[in-house]
From Swiss-Prot:
Entry-linked PANTHER family: 60 KDA HEAT SHOCK PROTEIN, MITOCHONDRIAL
Gene name in the database record: groEL1
Protein's organism: Prochlorococcus marinus (strain SARG / CCMP1375 / SS120)
Pfam families from the UniProt entry: Cpn60_TCP1
Protein name in UniProt: Chaperonin GroEL 1
EC code: 5.6.1.7
Length: 563
């Protein structure tokens, strides 16, 4: 494919246009009086959201150079979301100002490299000060963080705080759609562990990059699976049951993984594979725990069990499984409490008999995972659009509250950033030339979130920032009053602010130091009736039955590379 090349001011101008297009759409959502954004969908009703990263991921600009700028800023939101779970709009607002001021100064002849160094020094200084001001939280403060992070929804805040109280802050909390109009909290059996899907092709929700199955079956084994022949009998059985299948094994790779991916993407099977947690003997123990939780059988080499003899009765069952890139959460059915209690008692007896501190630690971890349970927040709403919006708010509140417990809190509403910005004056004076300019850029960016929160509340942003500096108090956009925001319950998680700043300066400094952009030349539209797009799976193979491989036919199961 041919490329288009742009350089110097022309390239940076196109990037900034893309940054502004995305940031202007996202920043209207910040604060308690932030507005909603309507996203058109190819199929079904449009989504109405006020979640920054959801909006950012949906934006695709026609101009390829501007689109590159938009996608770079989307990375700011996505990185902050992945690491902190919240603060995506704050990160976007910060990055927009940093990019604008940085490019304005480089166009006037400043050195982009020196500006970047100054910006990085300023952010490092701010992060140190931020952590010094951090206050640890518990009790009512957890409720306040959850309420603020959900956009001021007290019902959501109370539910998130209650869930954390019941299963602990480190416990497993999942969010799912309710069959009723009410939003409810339920505590059930379940487990989570740090292993994700074997291939991103197993993802069922591309926007959130997760694989989620309702009422799946589980094949649990300590074997490594490389040949599809090992799986054919169980796949045939599962295909007839029409249930999703999750394969939990030492590893699934090679021909077996490729075939599962092909058939999942062709809609023949709802399937995913996950690498088993832990290592060695502890892996077998962890798999046995999961087998008890799901009323399944561990297909183990130690018992001379083989995969070709697996029946439907050997497969575990769960109410729901959610698999991300890095973790798996199993929500068990309601009929496993007796078995789980018996398993926990067995592990406790083992704990009493060991003298090793390391073994005790690992056994206690297993007990915590099995006995801790899972808090399920069931989200209800009158319409599907409101349901999706409410679900996003709850997920934001959960993530932000965890972040607040982890690194503490500071006053919210952008007021802390403004006060920290005032401490950059001494750093700016200690630096020369363009590095000092970089520090000044960060200082200006730090007032942007408070300014935008005020604008969304119908106030003059510059006046509000000036009053915050004069009074030494924060601006409560919900009431229009200047007050002590921590006492008012308007608080931000230090981790969220820290990551928003660090991610924003990371991408902004890259944009400022860009000299050349190379983009794909847009292809002309194909004539009507022409050939359609190719198979998105490329050369992953035909739909030939497995009978041609000398294996039992699977009624349309595809093999990679077969024509």
């Amino acid at each position: 494919m041919s490329k288009i090349i742009r350089s110097s001011d022309e390239s940076r101008g196109a990037l900034e246009n893309g940054v502004n297009s995305l940031a202007d759409a996202v920043k209207v959502t910040i604060g308690p009086k932030g507005r909603n954004v309507v996203l058109e969908k190819k199929f079904g009703a449009p989504d109405i959201v006020n979640d920054g990263v959801t909006i950012a991921r949906d934006i695709e600009l026609e101009n390829p150079f501007e689109n590159l700028g938009a996608k770079l800023i989307e990375q700011v939101a996505s990185k902050t979301k992945d690491k902190a779970g919240d603060g995506t709009t704050t990160a976007t607002v910060l990055a927009q100002v940093m990019v604008h001021e940085g490019l304005k100064n480089t166009a006037a002849g400043a050195s982009p490299i020196e500006i970047r160094r100054g910006m990085e020094k300023a952010v490092s200084h701010i992060v140190d000060k931020l952590q010094q001001q951090s206050k640890k939280i518990s009790g009512d403060k957890v409720l306040q963080v959850a309420t603020v992070s959900s956009g001021g929804d007290e019902e959501i805040g109370a539910m998130v705080a209650e869930a954390m109280d019941k299963v602990s802050v480190d416990g497993v909390i999942t969010v799912e759609e309710s069959k009723s109009l009410n939003t409810e909290l339920e505590i059930t059996e379940g487990m989570a562990f740090d292993r994700g899907y074997s291939s991103p092709y197993f993802v069922t929700d591309a926007e959130r990059q997760i694989c989620e199955f309702e009422n799946p079956l589980l094949l649990i084994t300590d074997r490594k699976i490389s040949s599809i022949a090992d799986l054919v009998p169980v796949l045939e059985t599962v295909q007839k049951s029409s249930s999703p299948l999750v394969i939990l094994a030492e590893e699934v790779d090679g021909e077996a993984l490729a075939t599962l991916v092909v058939n999942k993407n062709r809609g023949v099977l709802q399937v995913a594979s996950v690498r088993a947690p832990s290592f060695g003997e502890r892996r077998k123990a962890a798999l046995a725990d999961i087998a008890v939780l799901t009323k399944g059988t561990l297909i183990s080499e130690d018992k001379a069990m083989t995969l070709d003899k697996v029946s439907l009765a050997d497969l575990g069952k769960a109410r729901k499984i959610t698999i991300t890139k890095e973790s798996t959460t199993i929500v068990a059915n309601d009929d496993t409490k007796k078995e789980v209690a018996s398993r926990v008692a067995s592990i406790k007896r083992e704990l009493d008999q060991t003298d090793s501190d390391y073994d005790k630690e690992k056994l206690n971890e297993r007990i915590a995972k099995l006995a801790g349970g899972v808090a399920v927040i069931k989200v209800g709403a009158p319409t599907e659009t409101e349901l999706k919006n409410r679900k996003l708010r709850i997920e934001d509140a959960l993530n932000a509250t965890r972040a607040a417990v982890e690194e503490g809190i500071v006053a919210g509403g952008g007021s802390t950033l403004i006060k920290l910005g005032e401490e950059l004056d001494s750093l700016s004076k200690s630096l020369d030339g363009d590095q000092a300019t970089g520090v000044d850029i960060i200082k200006k960016a730090l007032s942007a979130p408070a300014k935008q929160i005020a604008l969304n509340a119908g106030e003059n942003g510059d006046v509000v920032v000036s009053e915050i500096q004069r009074l030494g108090k924060g601006f409560n956009a919900a009431t229009g009053q200047y007050e002590d925001l921590i006492s008012a319950g308007i608080i931000d998680a230090v981790k969220v602010i820290r990551l928003a700043l660090q991610d924003a300066v990371s991408i902004a400094s890259l944009l400022i130091t860009t000299e050349v952009i190379i983009a794909d030349k847009p292809e002309p539209p194909s004539p009507a009736g022409g050939e359609g797009g190719g198979d998105p799976m490329g050369g992953m193979g035909g739909m030939g039955g497995m009978g041609g491989m000398g294996m039992p036919g699977m009624g349309g199961m595809g093999m990679p590379g077969m024509m």
